[in-house]
């Protein structure tokens, strides 16, 4: 039989059971627990107690396993606990966790390790008289403090409530008393790590142990793990004996196989000679255990020489002797004598041990176990929560970060806000949350933050966000509407009325009617001129009954639209026939409009433009004292022909279906919109405008400084048939001038017209300005005459959108065309066409007024044509572009060249 016996619970051999159960043998139970770094996980190696080194056995360590060690003639029962703090047990647990995927992060894994160790430690505190906490290093691991503190809370809050009841009901463990344990176990701290102090220097080792004892005692007292009353402490610390031991024997960490091989080689290499005491000692060290290779008789008779040496086993025996003599009473003098200490027989103790093992180890490991005792149930449910200080810490900082993030999100929230604002606020809150949140609870708290923010936004804070025709979202709360006009973005623009005299605030439109018609009807009530001025009526839908609806159609003319865009013609070629002479702007007598009047619409190609620019004429001003700089003068030849008998067959518009969008070149024939998107009014006589001072502020408000001048356009008109009306015109002119000087035939048939034009742009802040060319804003000086020519705006496409010169970098839109007609026996005609490009030049729409004939303007008058504020095709509104620059302005939309023309009129003396 080996000098020391062992078995693994609960498999106790019969022969060992008889030895332990005989004569009610009393034993001091010493628990060995802590950490180990060797594969065998045996922490008794440093005690020099084992006869066979654990490395030579085939037993694999396992979490929660308890191994009993005792000597035949000894009084100490060693309980060796294998826990998750043992390195190789932890490694096996980690490998299983990785393989199964149960633990998804280190925090959770570490929490599991700590919880399992704490269960075993609590169990050891209940069944042991002494506990040796083994540390393989030379430094005390302060992470034990949190475990000790948590176990003290668990014991006081749960264990002392349920354990006495369970022990009483089972008739086992009555010897444990009210404390439900043998005593307040005495803790010994055993450090296996070698220090820099040599084993021979005992005084320094003792000094180190004393200093470590003081530090450990202070930490335990500060955390209230030990108190003056040891019965109320988790465990006790001896008052007058050492409880810290540093192992200075390097053999405790030696590898027996490697050491044996080294010693054998040393022995074999030794010169031959007689044996001495050193050789005998060397041979004994080669044996894997005492008595190896010797007869059983010699082993039984031989006794180990007891040398007085410094060892943990000697320290333990001192404490054991005190336990047998007086018991442990480590309380202060005030509480001394009240402590509970009992040494039961092994048989009695073992029955209680099995019950406590089931309560503290087996039942918590069984996930399906259920108990009727509420206190025990609370213990099982809350043990992990209390022990797991890391998870609690990370949960608390996540909760703290979550609270701050919630407050940050709620701070200064508007009454309603958009999804973009919501996401921005959430990102700000989430950024604040991530400054604090750490650990495995981050994802769960992130989801809580997301749900919280979404719930606030969706429950009464969600903005409608329905986009306006200018791209601004509705600022009202989420609501159901029957009509788009019920939306409101809260954005206010500044715009002028139809005549341009009055500026007012306009709401961001949600329908074409709001943008192109309703606003101008409303502001007309505030304007002193709009409702009294002469105006041109544009064709609109006039229902014949109350049963009318919007037309449903597929734009079959889309291909025709694309082909006509580049030739500057409308698809209806019969209404506007092309010019026969491509190289001359002259109008022949055979080119008559339907009312038999001579008509000219300028639609110049590049070749004609070059020819026109080469013709220079002197300009004359009837009302100006100063002459303008020489500019391009266009000569128009007006011929008088016979009235055409043929009339174009016009299709009557529908009275039951209306056009849902705006009129454009490819709109179905016979469909008209419900309201006009254009406006043409006569502001008054031409004398309103004076080229010296520009457009008066009281007539047209909101113009930028120097940008309120119209551009003069001089057009030379030559008469081919003076006998028609030219002779009468010259006769009246001569009479008016009181002169009878005859003129040559050529000069009497030619005269110059001065027409003042202005293409006006207006930004959303109400800034207005005239442009002198497709890429140039008019810059007129104070007190000087603008010398720019109007031919640039007549013979070029003018962009619909252009950057406003104001500081806010707004986009201005072409909103008005100013025309001051001359005092002459001709009429200026206009036929505006707006081409809006949608991505490419092949995808565009040309919007028209809907009139079948060009508009004839009266003589000597100031006319203003107001263009649509919003454009809408068959598929819906066309959003104004963003990022408009001078270079790309013409790529978004243009007012097409060829808008202006001249038409003859009846001669009367009132015109002169």
Swiss-Prot record:
Matching InterPro entries: SMG8-like
Protein's UniProt name: Nonsense-mediated mRNA decay factor SMG8
Family membership: Belongs to the SMG8 family.
Keyword Coiled coil part of the UniProt annotation: no
Source organism (scientific name): Culex quinquefasciatus (Southern house mosquito)
GO biological process: nuclear-transcribed mRNA catabolic process, nonsense-mediated decay
Domain of life, per lineage: Eukaryota
Biased composition (Polar residues): 570-602
One protein family per Pfam: Smg8_Smg9
Physiological role: Involved in nonsense-mediated decay (NMD) of mRNAs containing premature stop codons. Probable component of kinase complex containing SMG1 and recruited to stalled ribosomes.
Basic and acidic residues bias: start-end ranges: 604-614
Endpoints of the signal sequence: none
Disordered as annotated region, ranges: 565-630
Keywords: Nonsense-mediated mRNA decay
């Amino acid at each position: 039989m080996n000098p020391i016996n062992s078995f693994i619970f609960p498999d106790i051999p019969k022969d060992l059971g008889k030895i332990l159960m005989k004569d009610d043998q009393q034993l001091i139970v010493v628990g060995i627990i802590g950490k180990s770094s060797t594969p065998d996980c045996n922490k008794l190696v440093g005690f020099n107690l084992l006869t066979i080194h654990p490395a030579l056995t085939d037993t694999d360590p396992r979490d929660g396993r308890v191994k009993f060690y005792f000597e035949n003639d000894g009084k100490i029962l060693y309980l060796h606990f294998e826990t998750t703090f043992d390195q190789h047990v932890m490694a096996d647990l980690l490998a299983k966790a990785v393989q199964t995927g149960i633990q998804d992060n280190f925090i959770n894994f570490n929490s599991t390790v700590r919880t399992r160790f704490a269960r075993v430690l609590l169990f050891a505190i209940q069944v042991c008289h002494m506990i040796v906490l083994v540390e393989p290093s030379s430094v005390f691991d302060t992470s034990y403090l949190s475990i000790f503190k948590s176990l003290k809370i668990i014991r006081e809050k749960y264990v002392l409530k349920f354990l006495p009841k369970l022990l009483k009901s089972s008739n086992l463990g009555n010897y444990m008393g009210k404390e439900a344990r043998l005593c307040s176990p005495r803790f010994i701290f055993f450090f296996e790590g070698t220090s820099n102090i040599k084993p021979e220097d005992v005084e320094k080792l003792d000094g180190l142990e004393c200093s470590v004892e003081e530090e450990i005692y202070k930490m335990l007292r500060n955390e209230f793990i030990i108190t003056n009353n040891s019965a109320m402490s988790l465990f006790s610390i001896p008052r007058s004996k050492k409880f810290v031991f540093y192992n200075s024997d390097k053999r405790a960490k030696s590898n027996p196989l490697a050491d044996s091989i080294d010693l054998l080689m040393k022995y074999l290499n030794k010169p031959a000679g007689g044996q001495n005491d050193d050789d005998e000692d060397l041979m004994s060290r080669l044996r894997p255990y005492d008595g190896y290779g010797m007869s059983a008789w010699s082993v039984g008779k031989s006794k180990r020489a007891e040398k007085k040496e410094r060892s943990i086993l000697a320290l333990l025996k001192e404490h054991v002797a005190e336990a047998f003599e007086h018991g442990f009473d480590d309380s202060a003098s005030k509480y001394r004598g009240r402590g509970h200490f009992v040494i039961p027989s092994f048989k009695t103790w073992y029955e209680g041990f099995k019950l406590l093992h089931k309560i503290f180890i087996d039942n918590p490991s069984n996930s399906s176990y259920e108990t009727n005792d509420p206190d025990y149930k609370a213990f099982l449910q809350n043990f992990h929560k209390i022990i797991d200080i890391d998870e609690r810490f990370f949960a608390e900082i996540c909760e703290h970060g979550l609270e701050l993030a919630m407050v940050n999100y709620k701070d200064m929230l508007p009454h309603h806000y958009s999804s973009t604002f919501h996401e921005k606020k959430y990102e700000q809150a989430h950024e604040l949350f991530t400054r604090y949140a750490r650990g495995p609870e981050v994802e769960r708290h992130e989801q809580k933050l997301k749900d919280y923010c979404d719930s606030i936004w969706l429950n009464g804070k969600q903005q409608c966000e329905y986009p306006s025709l200018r791209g601004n979202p509705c600022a009202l709360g989420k609501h159901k509407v029957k009509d788009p006009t019920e939306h409101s973005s809260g954005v206010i623009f500044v715009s002028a009325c139809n005549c341009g005299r009055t500026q007012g605030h306009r709401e961001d439109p949600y329908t074409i009617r709001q943008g192109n018609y309703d606003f101008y009807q409303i502001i007309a009530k505030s304007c002193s001129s709009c409702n009294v001025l002469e105006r041109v009526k544009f064709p609109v839908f006039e229902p014949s009954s109350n049963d009318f609806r919007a037309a449903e159609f597929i734009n079959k003319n889309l291909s025709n639209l694309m082909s006509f865009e580049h030739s500057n013609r409308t698809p209806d070629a019969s209404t506007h026939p092309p010019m026969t002479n491509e190289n001359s702007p002259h109008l022949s007598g055979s080119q008559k409009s339907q009312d038999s009047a001579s008509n000219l619409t300028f639609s110049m190609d590049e070749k004609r433009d070059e020819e026109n620019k080469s013709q220079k004429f002197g300009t004359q001003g009837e009302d100006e004292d100063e002459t303008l700089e020489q500019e391009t003068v266009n000569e128009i030849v007006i011929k008088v022909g016979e009235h055409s008998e043929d009339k174009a067959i016009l299709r009557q518009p529908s009275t039951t279906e209306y056009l849902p969008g705006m009129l454009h070149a490819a709109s179905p024939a016979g469909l008209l919109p419900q309201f006009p998107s254009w406006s043409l009014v006569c502001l008054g006589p031409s004398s309103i405008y004076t080229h010296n001072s520009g457009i008066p502020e009281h007539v047209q408000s909101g113009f930028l400084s120097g940008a309120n001048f119209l551009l003069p356009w001089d057009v030379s008109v030559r008469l081919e048939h003076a006998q028609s009306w030219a002779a009468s015109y010259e006769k009246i002119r001569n009479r008016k001038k009181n002169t009878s000087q005859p003129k040559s035939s050529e000069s009497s048939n030619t005269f110059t017209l001065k027409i003042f034009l202005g293409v006006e742009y207006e930004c959303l802040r109400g800034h207005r300005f005239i442009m002198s060319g497709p890429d140039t804003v008019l810059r007129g000086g104070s007190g000087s005459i603008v010398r720019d020519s109007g031919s640039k705006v007549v013979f070029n496409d003018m962009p619909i959108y252009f950057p406003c010169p104001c500081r806010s970098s707004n986009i201005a839109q072409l909103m008005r065309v100013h025309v001051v007609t001359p005092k002459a026996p001709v009429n200026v005609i206009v036929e505006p066409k707006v081409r809006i490009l949608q991505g490419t030049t092949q995808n565009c729409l040309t919007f028209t007024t809907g009139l079948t004939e060009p508009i004839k303007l009266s003589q000597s008058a100031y006319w203003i044509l107001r263009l649509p504020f919003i454009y809408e095709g068959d598929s819906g509104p066309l959003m104004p572009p963003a990022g408009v620059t001078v270079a790309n302005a013409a790529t978004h939309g243009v007012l097409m060249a060829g808008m202006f023309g001249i038409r003859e009129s009846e001669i009367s003396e009132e015109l002169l």
